[in-house]
Amino acid sequence: MSSAQTDNGPLLAVSGLGKRFGGFVALENIDLTIATGERVGLIGPNGSGKSTLVNCLCGTLRNETGAVLFDGRPVDGLIAHERTRLGLARSFQLPKPFHTLNLIDNLRVPLLYTVNARPGHHLSDEQVAARCAELLEAVALADKARRLPRDLTQVEMRKLELARAVATEPRLLFADEAMAGLSPSEVEEIIAVLLRLNQQGITIVLIEHIMRAVMSFSTRLLVLVAGQKIADGLPQEVMRNPEVERAYLGE
């Protein structure tokens, strides 16, 4: 397991995680830790198990073996929305906003059903409205607050997806392919948003195929190949790893 952690232990600790689909081994004996405040890139060729790993960690899928601890608490038995209420959130590769709701109301839903569902938390209507406005400002969508998702460009839709995830007030955010299909300048916009979120205290794991973006954002890389973790370390060191070179370039 990686040594990256805080004095109080890692924010996320995974040991021996495995997942099968019938006879197919999707993940095998995955060990990893994520420390509070980190910016981690999770990379690997198509079919390497990245999405399956994220789904297991976020509660969409159930791992057959191993253990997942979030802030020291076992979460293997919790489903996705229960993990989200603890502070473990994700954005999706294919954004699925509420198409009949404007942007403010798209953010109001996770605030009401995640943040307000936490013990001891209750945001007033005024606080919810203020937080929605703050989130839209953070992703440069304040001028679209009353618009519907269908009115957004592709990069704006990506920003809305991130804002919806951040509305749950996560401590750890998995950003899954947040830049897919974007132009180089739009990729830079999303990197800037993610960096701001990290500076505000959100630990982020970026799952991404655009290596320029991964290298620009990440302070650490994890590499999956064929359901196994083959590298974990500083970006420049990982990219010089012979196993990683073979995985991407072949023999």
Task: List the predicted regions and their residue ranges.
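Helix-to-loop junction immediately C-terminal to a conserved catalytic motif
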Residues: 58
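Catalytic Walker B motif of ABC-type/P-loop ATPase nucleotide-binding domains
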Residues: 173-177
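Conserved catalytic motifs of ABC-family nucleotide-binding domains
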Residues: 169
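The feature captures the beta-strand-to-loop junction immediately N-terminal to the Walker
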Residues: 43-45
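Conserved ABC nucleotide-binding domain
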Residues: 76-77, 135-156
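Conserved ABC transporter NBD signature motif
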Residues: 66-75, 86, 120
